[in-house]
A protein has these predicted regions:
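Conserved beta-strand-loop-beta-strand element in the redox core of flavoprotein oxidoreductases
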Residues: 1, 31-33, 189-197
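A conserved short coil-to-beta-strand element within the FAD-binding core of flavoproteins
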Residues: 42, 152-156, 164, 179-196
Length: 197
């Protein structure tokens, strides 16, 4: 066999049926259990107490989007995640978009992102303690002294031992700082689901 491009798509994602762990007590739980991949368009969460399980990209996208309507929202996390809050638009991307064709601009931006990503990962692997401090300080810059950064935003592992979570424009931090967001962080291991009013 020969080819110019070979895709090896052996990932663990299943977009038809996303992974849902088996929770003891699920059948007796009186609330709703919603998987983000099966989000009902008519989901009513106005003034409800919501728990989002996880601390990755989906959680940091869902939480700010729901925060204004819920009575309280809790991020239940097994372990904190490293967050990085880059701008969603970079000046170089905008420059290339303005002064090149779409095809050339896309090609250049794509390669810039690939090379920058590879460089960043290689640097983190060479100096993990330096970048751990940098990432944690980035969260501190967004949240100030309002949160227990060590408990809720400092993983026990080194950066890139697990995936880093990008939070474009730091919107979850903005939501937390707004004071409008009724958010709790809880470290957990779920043993039983129950409904407590």
């Amino acid at each position: 066999m020969s080819c110019n491009i070979l895709y090896l798509c052996g990932g663990y994602y299943n977009y038809d049926e996303g992974y849902t762990p088996e929770f003891k007590g699920k059948d007796n739980f009186q609330g709703q259990i919603i998987h983000p991949q099966k989000w009902p368009e008519d989901l009513d969460y106005l003034d409800k107490k919501v728990v989002v399980i996880g601390s990755g990209a989906t959680a940091v996208t869902i939480i700010p989007a729901m925060a204004e309507k819920v009575s309280h929202i809790t991020m239940l996390q097994r372990s904190p995640t490293y967050y990085m809050a880059p701008p969603d638009r970079m000046w170089l991307d905008e420059f290339l978009k303005k002064y090149t064709t779409d095809k050339i601009g896309y090609f250049l931006v794509r390669w810039k992102n690939i090379l920058l990503g590879r460089f960043f990962v290689s640097q983190i692997k060479k100096k993990p303690l330096k970048y751990k401090e940098m990432l944690i300080n980035g969260v501190k810059e967004h949240l100030g002294d309002n949160y227990d950064i060590d408990k809720h935003f400092t993983p026990k592992y080194m950066p890139w031992d697990q995936r880093l979570c990008l939070v474009p424009n730091g919107d979850i931090f903005e939501a937390i700082n707004s004071g409008f967001m009724k958010l709790s962080f809880v470290l957990y291991n779920i043993s039983l689901l129950s409904c407590v009013s």
